[in-house]
Structure formats: C-alpha cells, structure tokens
Amino acid sequence: MSITQTNLDNILPLVARGKVRDIYEVDEKTLLFVATDRISAYDVIMENGIPQKGQLLTQLSEFWFEFLKPYIKTHLIEVDDIFAHLPKVLSEDRYKSQLQGGSLLVRKYKLVPLEVIVRGYITGSAWKVYKKSGTVHGVKAAEGLQESQEFPTPIFTPSTKAEQGEHDENISVEQAEAIVGKELADKIGKVAVELYSKAKGYAAGRGIIIADTKFEFGLDDDNELVLVDEVLTPDSSRFWNAKTYEVGKGQDSYDKQFLRDWLTSNGLAGKEGVSMTEDIATRSRVKYVEAYEALTGKKWE
C-alpha cells in the first residue's frame, strides 16, 4: 500500500503540496515535511505511488544531513521523535501511519529562489545540449566529451525554481546572479560544489557514482546559507552503479530513469493521468531500496 496524499484534518495548516512532499506548519518557526509515496517524471505526477518511497527518501535525507552537518548548517530538527513536537492528537494511529518514518521536522528559513544543480558527469539534458552546441548551461565545455564522461571538475548549473505544474528552466550562472546577486550566487556555487564533492567521495567508497544532484538553500537571520529540502536522494540525484559504469553510453541508475524510460517507450512521457503497472512500481521501489542500502550500509526493513 502506498500513501499518495496525507490528510491531517486541518490539525496543522497545509502550507504546500509539492510533487512528492506535503508541507505543514507546526509553528511560526517550524515546518513538517512529509514525503509521500508520490512519484513524478517529466513534471507529471503518476496516479499511483511506490510503497515506502517517502520513508526511503526521508531516511536517506536524514543520513546525508548528518553526513554534511560538519560542513554546513541544515534545516533538520528531528526525524525519529517528531511526535514529541506535534499536537498529541497526531500520535493517533490514523495520523501516525501517515507520518511515521517519512517526516522531517525542520526549521523555517527564507528560501533562495534557485535549484542548485551540480554536475560531475555529462548526462541527461546537459548531454543533449552539449551534443548540439558544445556548451553546458551556456558555457563552452571541453571538446570531445562522451556521454557519461566525468567533467574535469564538477560544475554548478543553476535552474529556476518553478511553481507546481510548471517546468524548471536551466539558466546560466550570469542569470542566477541577476536573480540573487553576484556575491550570493558565487557563494552558492562554491558551497554546492564542495558538498557534492564530499558526498561523491563517500559514495564512491560504497560503489555508487553520484553523477549529479540538486541542492536547495535557505538563508538564516545572519544571511548565512542553510541546506534545506531533501538532499542526495534518488529523486534529486543521479546515482550510478560504479561496477557497470562505462563511458560512451547511458548508465544503470538507482533513480527515476527507470520510470522515465518506461514512459518514453510507451509514448506516455509528459501525459497526465498515467498509472504505473504493478511491475514498474515494484521494480522502481527495488532501485530506491538498493540506493538506500548501498549508501547507508543499513538493511531496509
């Protein structure tokens, strides 16, 4: 059984319902991020979900928030004991079953209006653009790169943060500077590449290549960067199997590429009202579990 939408009967105000997360306000300084089992591809949410996906995303985000805590402030307050911070009624089974294991209690910060993407390898949309123009996000890239090849150094490639139902738009660093200012854009790019590099090095030791990832940042009262949202999950990243990695082709991945491929091959990419087959949902869940277990070293129960 999958949870594709939460319902807390207005005990907490619903702030937003995103592609995956339902966000509730606990108080003026605190939010509850509930990762549901919804899954989207090509900016469309599937009609059915993937069992335990929300819990897998949440537990993996918690792992990475702890891993990156020495390097940056994060918005995470609590995962395991959220009910101590919530109205007592939410401990009742009908609510607890929706929240347990899939919720992050987080501090509220002013959001930076950018999707902060770091690419270590050329793949996906970056590869498509490079083949046509030899550029990545408007910047001239090295000549002769092959699909899935590692960049000499990771690159910061921002995009706009679109509203629900709209498409994120890849932009240049100069366009990002126009949105948030040069000083903040420079800082974000530097910090994001550093965080990616720390995670990439760790993952390599676990047999996983982090090809690229998306970070989101907030600002605290002192205008210092804070890592927010989810972090380094199969929804926000491309994870590849290092054992089967081979330059010059697409890679075995532990992310939504499996679903994207199925939609494309069936002529369903970008169409509303699509339900995954049980087989696709099950096989997608296996990918999420494999990523969790490989990266954390823990068995998923």
From Swiss-Prot:
Gene3D superfamilies: ATP-grasp fold, B domain, Phosphorylase Kinase, domain 1
GO cellular component, one term: cytoplasm
Top EC class, one word: ligase
Keyword Protease: no
Taxonomy, superkingdom: Eukaryota
Reactions the enzyme catalyzes: 5-amino-1-(5-phospho-D-ribosyl)imidazole-4-carboxylate + L-aspartate + ATP = (2S)-2-[5-amino-1-(5-phospho-beta-D-ribosyl)imidazole-4-carboxamido]succinate + ADP + phosphate + 2 H(+)
Enzyme Commission (EC) number: 6.3.2.6
Keyword Coiled coil in record: no
GO process annotations (BP): 'de novo' IMP biosynthetic process
Family per similarity comment: Belongs to the SAICAR synthetase family.
Name assigned to this protein: Phosphoribosylaminoimidazole-succinocarboxamide synthase
Native species: Cyberlindnera jadinii
